[in-house]
């Protein structure tokens, strides 16, 4: 709000603090998407794979992953795109010795999985050198690529197959 010619910031105490056992604690802002992108020289080339739009900053994803108290979780990203989530999981495991896993899914539009996601994660695991000469050390991890597709079957075949499995 404005008081005279000066702009004043106004916030409700309940929005910026937390009451724990009768003590009032100030909440700290953890940052925004833009705080994380400003730290990165060129977000579009992260992981040594060119990707114009939609890459999520690794530092931001690592921060989100680290908020979960355990280090043996499986992180699911069903809009995988450039593979940022997988990159962040691998990097966070290297940083804190965790055993997290990830599952990345995509509809493979424009062959994105084969040409971007897989190559990026392979680069992260093997290590790479950027075109500017910056060296990224290998990060130990394993990577498997599966192609899943719809296979139409008749209802009768479906139940026969289900009986075989059971």
Name the predicted role of every residue range.
Residues 91, 95, 158-163:
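Hydrophobic alpha-helical segments
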Residues 1, 57, 149-150, 166:
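General structural signal for secondary-structure boundaries
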Residues 104-156, 162-165:
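Conserved phosphoryl-transfer catalytic core
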Residues 1-74:
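Class I S-adenosyl-L-methionine
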Residues 58-130:
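Conserved S-adenosyl-L-methionine
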Residues 42-44, 154-157:
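Short, solvent-exposed loop/turn elements at domain surfaces
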Residues 23-28, 96, 136-138:
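Short glycine/proline-enriched loop/turn "hinge" motifs that connect secondary-structure elements
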